[in-house]
Amino acid sequence: MKQAIGFIDSGVGGLTVVREVLKQLPHEQVYYLGDTARCPYGPRDKEEVAKFTWEMTNFLVDRGIKMLVIACNTATAAALYDIREKLDIPVIGVIQPGSRAALKATRNNKIGVLGTLGTVESMAYPTALKGLNRRVEVDSLACPKFVSVVESGEYKSAIAKKVVAESLLPLKSTKIDTVILGCTHYPLLKPIIENFMGDGVAVINSGEETASEVSALLDYHNLLDATDEEIEHRFFTTGSTQIFKDIAKDWLNMPDMTVEHIKLGK
């Protein structure tokens, strides 16, 4: 019987990471939990985010996952190291992979970071980037409206274009040549963000680099699955199963997927 890779996020954003993992590792089985009922995590304090992240983690660990991907930047910043220390399975977040991808892309060492308020205030990206390259200059920008645009399914709409233009205006006057999408919801807005920032700015979706790290870690721990056993992906949400399914079907191209509603916490 296949063991799944577990993915957790505050909502549908982590599906952007799942998509990249399934591209690179098509034999792997995915269990995904989106805490849509309590989304967004960005404005919440670190202790509350850590508590919610542990609740999601325990739910998937109880279902026998072989690895955990914290596919949420805010949750990664709040709880990655604590969870990694206490679990006996491999655990990765999305901040280090995103930072590495940005440093590969930049030509002038001037990098912008778009994130939730929680991620920006944590200074997790500047810390990670400067830990890898001390010469890098980082401009961080909180974009609190982006998550609600994605969660409402409006990420291809005129509303999305307006919100992106208004939110990113401060970055247009900087000399950055690379932007990290420092929230896993934001890649659903990537075409609009790329169009607004222009051809001279590389827009980094940390999902690809995270997927490469997932592959490397599974290989290192001898957990890669190359068998042709039947794959049963499972998707869980604390919010509306229909809204989750509509976005997930569009993003993952899984027309027959089912989504299970669960409750977390009290």
Swiss-Prot record:
Described purpose of this protein according to its UniProt entry: Provides the (R)-glutamate required for cell wall biosynthesis.
A UniProt-annotated Pfam family: Asp_Glu_race
Superkingdom of origin organism: Bacteria
Gene Ontology MF term list: glutamate racemase activity
Keywords per UniProt: Cell shape, Cell wall biogenesis/degradation, Isomerase, Peptidoglycan synthesis
Keyword Cell wall biogenesis/degradation: yes
NCBIfam families for this protein: glut_race, PRK00865.1-3
Pathway(s) where this gene product acts: Cell wall biogenesis; peptidoglycan biosynthesis
InterPro entries xrefs: Asp/Glu/hydantoin_racemase, Asp/Glu_race, Asp/Glu_racemase_AS_1, Asp/Glu_racemase_AS_2, Glu_race
Residues the record marks as active site: 72 (proton donor/acceptor), 183 (proton donor/acceptor)
GO biological process, any: regulation of cell shape
Protein's name in the database: Glutamate racemase
Keyword Cell wall biogenesis/degradation assigned: yes
Catalytic reaction list: L-glutamate = D-glutamate
Binding site for substrate: 9-10, 41-42, 73-74, 184-185
Family, as annotated: Belongs to the aspartate/glutamate racemases family.
Record Gene3D superfamilies: 3.40.50.1860
EC number: 5.1.1.3
